Amino acid sequence: MLSYKKVLIVGRPNVGKSALFNRILDTKRSITENTYGVTRDLVEEVCKVGSFKFKLIDTGGFTILKDEISKIVVQKVLSSLEKVDLILLVLDVNEILLEDYQIIERLRKYSNKVILVLNKVDAKDKEFLAHEFHNLGFKRCFLVSAVHCRGIAKLRDFLKVEVGEANIEDEVNIKVGIIGKPNSGKSTLINYLSGNEISIVSDKPGTTRDFIKTKLTRNGKVFEIIDTAGIRRRARVNEIVEYYSVNRALKVIDMVDIVFLLIDVKEELTSQDKKIAHYVTKKGKGIIIVFSKWDLVKESKGYFEALKSRVKFFFPVLNFAPIFRISVHKKIGLDSLFKEAFKLKDQLEFKTSTPDLNKMLNLWIKDYHLNVSHKIKYITQVSANPVRFILFANKIKNFPNSYYNYLVNNLRKIGYNNIPILVELREKIRDLK
């Protein structure tokens, strides 16, 4: 799989790194909020300028704070410097602080690939402030305002020439979203899959705030894996940033083909897990229930089967969904998980012709004793991925649930065993004679 040249955005918190990242991408990808240390993970995205592409990476703020998360963020930034082709050092043109000087010193040995970006040059009369930064020793400098989009086009054109590559196509065969409560093992899994620590792993719940993308190849097919901030109950969302992360996690479900719903095997199933399951099925996405941290379980005979029965009782809406157990540390169940994802993707893309459907429908009707006042006319599949059917009847009021479920169960047997299928009842208008 071809790889893109990489551009890393670095700087202390609140200099506008994420706003610049979004402007260069021309989208709202990183969370931007006037709160210290909003971006924590490495947020990667392929940037397209004309027909040229490169990978743009937003980072957490370089800070002198000594708390655990701040130290992890700084270490992640420093470990990324060797691996990239260009470094955009973002400074606030209005002030330079101790943290700015600290990161400048760390960047000295990479000066040949450092581009100085002076942000918050919101008006022309601020351009004179740039002269105060010439003594920092970096040859290339851009004056921008990420908020007002000043200087962004010039910077994008520069990046296109310096690192942009044409005609690179990474066809993605399967998009997978890793969803679950905070600290359920999502970031550990995606770090293992990517081979890099792009997502912060900590014992503190809620350390991932953006969604993190990575690509990998399995059996000649390209997976795009998206990790999200943990979904928590809205009543407990106290910060604006956490609110955005919850909404972004729900948007990720909309973006992907298949969801891995990660559940910490040591935690109880919750109503929030159930709400996630309902949202996924309502959207017609494939879903695999994944119990993580299986290495922590002292397994007794029949424990996994009992656990699966409990899940099916707790999640009746997911009685079709596969259930897996994994341990990243012990390398348990990971290959099987991807094989199952291939299987689900095939089912999502399977489409049955209308004539074949109606032949089977006639057989199902004969095998079922239905109230004579409700008559099925015909059925058609209107889409794949999500799989949607429309079932036409002479009337839909008081349509028996038992018969509806009977039809859905029969539809599953023809090639949709492990995925949600959406069946809409419609009333067939009587032909006028």
Swiss-Prot record:
Biological classification of the source: Bacteria, Pseudomonadati, Spirochaetota, Spirochaetia, Spirochaetales
Swiss-Prot/TrEMBL GO biological process terms: ribosome biogenesis
Annotated HAMAP family: GTPase_Der
Annotated GO MF terms: GTP binding
Role summary: GTPase that plays an essential role in the late steps of ribosome biogenesis.
Record PROSITE patterns: G_ENGA (PS51712)
PANTHER family: GTPASE DER
EngA-type G domain ranges (all copies): 5-167, 174-349
Record flagged with keyword Cell membrane: no
Family according to the record: Belongs to the TRAFAC class TrmE-Era-EngA-EngB-Septin-like GTPase superfamily. EngA (Der) GTPase family.
The entry's keywords: GTP-binding, Nucleotide-binding, Repeat, Ribosome biogenesis
Record-annotated KH-like domain positions: 350-429
Family annotation (Pfam families): KH_dom-like (PF14714), MMR_HSR1 (PF01926)
Subunit structure: Associates with the 50S ribosomal subunit.
Protein name: GTPase Der
Keyword Lyase attached: no
InterPro entries: G_ENGA, GTP-bd, GTPase_Der, KH_dom-like, KH_dom-like_a/b, P-loop_NTPase, Small_GTP-bd
Organism encoding this protein: Borreliella afzelii (strain PKo)
Top-level taxonomic group: Bacteria
Binding site residues for GTP 2: 180-187, 227-231, 292-295
Binding residues for GTP 1: 11-18, 58-62, 119-122
